[in-house]
Amino acid sequence: MINVMYKNSCPNCGGDISGDRLLNGLPCEACLPYINGIDDVDHISKVKTLYNILLNNDKIKNYWNLYYNITTFETVFKYFRDKTGYEPWSLQKLWLRRLASNQSFTMSAPTGLGKTTTLMTYSVFIGQDVVYIVPTKSLMEQVCKRLEKLGAQVSCGKIDQKKVSVITISYLNKNADSIVSLKPNFVVIDDADAVIKSGKTTDRLVSLLGIPKDVYESAIQLIRLRNKYYFSNEYTEEVKEKIRELELKIAEFKDKISQLVIASATIRPKGIKQKALRLLTGFEPSSIQLYARNIIDAYTENLDLSIVKELGSGGLILVSKEYGRSKLNEIKKYVEDLGFNAKLAISGRKFLDDFSQGKVDILVGSASYYGVAVRGIDEPKRLKYVIYYGVPKIRAKLFDALSNPFTLLRVGKLIGIDFSKLQNKILILNPSEVQLLKFSIIKGESINYHKLEQLRQELLYYMSLVKDKLKEKVEDTLISDSFVITKQNGNYYIVYPDMITYLQGSGRASRLYNGGLTLGFSIILVDDRHIFEILEKKMQKLFPNTTFTSLSNTNLSEIKIKLEDSRKEEGNRVHFNISTGLLIVESPTKAKTIAKMFSRPSVRIRNKVPVYETIIVDGNQIYVLDIVASKGHIVDLTLEDIGYYGIKVEDDGTIKPYYDLIKKCLDCNKIFSSASDKCPYCGSANLQSAQTTINLLRELALSVDKVFIASDPDTEGEKIAYDLASFLSPYNSNVYRVVYHEITKKAILEALRNPKKINTNLVMSQIVRRIEDRWIGFTLSNLLKTKFNGHNHGAGRVQTPVLGWIVNKTIKYKSAMGHVVYIDIAGYSIKKYFSEKRKVEEYINNLQVARIEKISEEKILLSPLPPFTTDTLLIEANMKYKLPANLVMKIAQDLFEAGLITYHRTDSTHISSVGIEIAKEYLQKQALIKEFVPRSWESSEEGAHEAIRPTRAIDVNELIQEIEENPYKYSIRFSKLHLLIYDLIFKRFIASQMSHAVGTKSRYLIKLGKDDNVDVELLSNAEGGFIKVYPVKVYNLPVGEIQPKVNITKGSSEQLLSYSDVISLMKSKGIGRPSTYAKTIENLMKHGYIVSSKRKSYLIATNRGISVYQFLSSKFYDLVSESTTSRLMTKLDDIALSKLNASTVLLEIFSEISTLVNPLKSEQNV
């Protein structure tokens, strides 16, 4: 039996505890030796029961905190029920838990989900020293009345620390002196826009929160230093130290300020003071997140507003910005002439009050993202439809817009300028670099950082080329896939559709009401067909089911009835089930990718870890998820002196691996797993511990309904999931494993719909592999250190035979050194080896011409290769681009985490029905559908591992276009290599779904001299089928005499091994796995056993490597041989498939090591 033990991890005493106990939500045996009868009780009852038992046995320690939090939440929920008369919804429970935990955050939910009720009830619960800030006096009076109804002692219009104070932004600004360092318990901001827009108001809020002036100024200074020096040649150690000092000062004060909650915001902070406030509070005000749409989208090809007459009262007309204020007045008058009461929705709230009360029929406003008509109206019963007068657009002067490198690139390409030299430099820019370049170009200032200054000069040159080229154009309109360039009165403008304004504005007609989403109607009066088509395309990418229906094809009478019906008390609305969750992934990039995929997430920083809150809509199911990265493994086998290298093997055969939290030294960057508070390598106390992540995850798990663990879909990912589930189960009993093989909306939704239990067979396989690696590695490494008197010696079961291959080839290569003549025959190379230089000279002198005869020729069918597996991708990338395996894996990891390819650690060539559809879609786009031949390649269950393939039907050129149009869409920084590898994966996959090609195989006789004939068969032609996407190398040798090109170099009759050779051997001999190919070679290099040749990337053994291998193979051949390693790999696979018992395999390994190693330890000649 294997009994996993976690060091210092009991949720009560902090002692050692088994994984089984943690998964059952129990403390360790020392705290609670025996208990039964609580397995089937709910989580809250279990916590209470355990608390009482621990308390009665005088064992209560840290478990008190868990009990306190649970009971506090219960108290707050009961108070809410008593005050409101109903049970809080799942989302309200999430907010109440955060509030009760004294967290500062933004409520990013739309109106109708109980934000105001939650905040008011909690304010009354606290009872005093609460400040509730609202934008207007009328809203202040409404809030005061509601608070009084809930039973609060209210101070309306001024601050009284013994009451709940409700004030306006105006009061905050006018009473600066009286609010300095009041530091109330709880501060609510109903509408954060006034704070975000005004630096002065931010100053006042900072004072109110109790933030000392010097701490606030330090935050401002820190932001300025980061902005100034991040890309500067003056980013010295002195500047870095100053930044560290400021960060430390701010971190020490963060938990000492008032709790701040922002109920809503429509814009994000941009000013330096607002960014300082974000730094101090740990979160930024985020805009209301879109949960779902229930809207009929329509359009008409004219600007006729007479439709208002048919639709009647309850409309909002949004006028495209370029028409100006005069058009708003003109439309208002037109509507009034139709017999309706109309009012401009430009500023203030009076228009909304009148509209709500039925005094106004139609509102007229500007289609502006920041306008009150687009963001400030929430009238679910009254507002039924929105009419856009003109397609909503963003219009800017073209030459100003060209200061953005990505805009310059897109415009340049559109007008035919060759940007090939500049493209890759622009594509790899991060957001900060783009901003710095933009502002330096606009201001005409140089950049104190050579690389960016050089790029700025190049951008200025290309800007002048674009301007000159535009002057040559006779057309007044230039159209691209994502924007339009127009010429008006001699000036050029760039125009984009404003999709966000369309979404927000049309969303005014579809609001949450009585737990359901009302039906809305949106009509665009199209004034620019090109811009409308771009908008339609963008909308369909975001909401695939979106369809814009021509107004002439709609039944307005029927729509009007449906609009009215959805606003009745028991009307037909779209109802949702909202649940809250914590989604844990491995990497920060993946967390960001998933969060951005579904909505514009809000971010808060907890314990220096970003927590993304996002909304995932799946039909009528809505998930409000916190997404956090564990950063891979959180524990590893302990380095403490326990058992045999951290694993106890007991007399009854029980195996107890002890795991300790992973720590990273921030000075030497080494990683270790022990209880030590100092780095064992350099002695530094500047450490980063996984305990910080665990504490955060436990805190978040307490606040949500469910925990979803979404680590990678392999044995390592399963072990990570097991560890996380162990640490979190005492805090939330609803812990699930979710698995996906690609990061796409469809895959994430499918994973959430089908949560699973953790696969303990995969976990056991990983545990056996890790223990075996520890035992073999530590045992042999210590013997090597003794033998060779040095550090950085290591050995492993897989590494050693691989080292042996490279050592043997290196020795043979060196022993057969001589001279090599390369003869180039029209692109086909012939290699000749000579041991002596004089023979080379003789050969060259006799080689005057080469005579080529074509002996035969035949037509053959060429089959496409299967899509890539891990090994074939590494081999192809090395052969084609000479890239090392670890770099290819790093790039593939980036592409996977960006959602561009499926999981890259796979040995399957299987292609799912989803993958086949992607190939079909692409071939249809490229007019190659006749070549489509669907292949699954190998049978497998749907949802199982697939080959490496793209997740969408976009080739590398379309990907580049996407990056140009939206540089911040992906959460990775692209390089030229990312594009090369993506292109390789994409083309190989598409080719695998295409028809055979027809080739010509030709046999040639090449006569190089007397008795020196070379007979070769070469592919001389290939066409049709998959060749159209994935060309193959062909040789078309000319018949007759030619003058060959000759190159002479030192060389050997033996060939060294390349990366691709080693990976092929690992695969064929059964000792490699997708997760170990690159890592094995990388580890051999780290130990200094092998090096890679610069020009051809051959792997060469060093003298150190040769000595180590000779020692290991002579003393431990049976332990590290190919056959033994291959058998172990098979056993690990069998454990994962539940065919073998894990503890049996480990006991065999332990016996094997003891038998071979113990006698050697006593030898004097080690």
UniProtKB/Swiss-Prot annotation:
Activity as a function of temperature: Optimum temperature is 70-75 degrees Celsius, between 60 and 80 degrees Celsius high levels of positive supercoils are seen in vitro. Active at 80 degrees, much less active at 88 degrees Celsius in vitro.
Cofactor binding note: Binds 2 zinc ions per subunit.
UniProt catalytic activity: ATP + H2O = ADP + phosphate + H(+)
Zn finger residue spans: RG C-terminal-type: 662-689
Protein's GO biological process: DNA topological change
Chain segments carrying region Topoisomerase I: 576-1166
Binding residues annotated for Mg(2+), in chain numbering: E586, D712
GO CC term (a single one): cytoplasm
Enzyme class: isomerase
Zn finger spans (RG N-terminal-type): 1-40
Induction: No change in protein levels during shifts from 80 to 88 or 88 to 80 degrees Celsius (at protein level). Constitutively transcribed during cell growth; no change is seen in the presence of methyl methanesulfonate (MMS). 0.7 mM MMS reduces the amount of enzyme at a post-translational level via a metalloprotease (at protein level). At 72 degrees Celsius this gene is transcribed at low levels during early and late exponential growth (until about 50 hours), declines as stationary phase starts, transcripts never disappear completely.
Binding site residues for ATP: Q92, A109, P110, T111, G112, L113, G114, K115, T116
Keywords, ordered alphabetically: ATP-binding, Cytoplasm, DNA-binding, Isomerase, Magnesium, Metal-binding, Nucleotide-binding, Repeat, Topoisomerase, Zinc, Zinc-finger
Parts forming coiled coils: none
Essential cofactor(s): Zn(2+); Mg(2+)
Pfam families in the record: DEAD, Topoisom_bac, Toprim, zf_Rg
One MF annotation (Gene Ontology) recorded for this entry: ATP binding
Domain Toprim, chain residue ranges per copy: 580-743
Subunit structure, as described in the record: Monomer.
Protein name per Swiss-Prot or TrEMBL: Reverse gyrase 2
Organism of origin: Saccharolobus solfataricus (strain ATCC 35092 / DSM 1617 / JCM 11322 / P2)
Lineage: Archaea, Thermoproteota, Thermoprotei, Sulfolobales, Sulfolobaceae
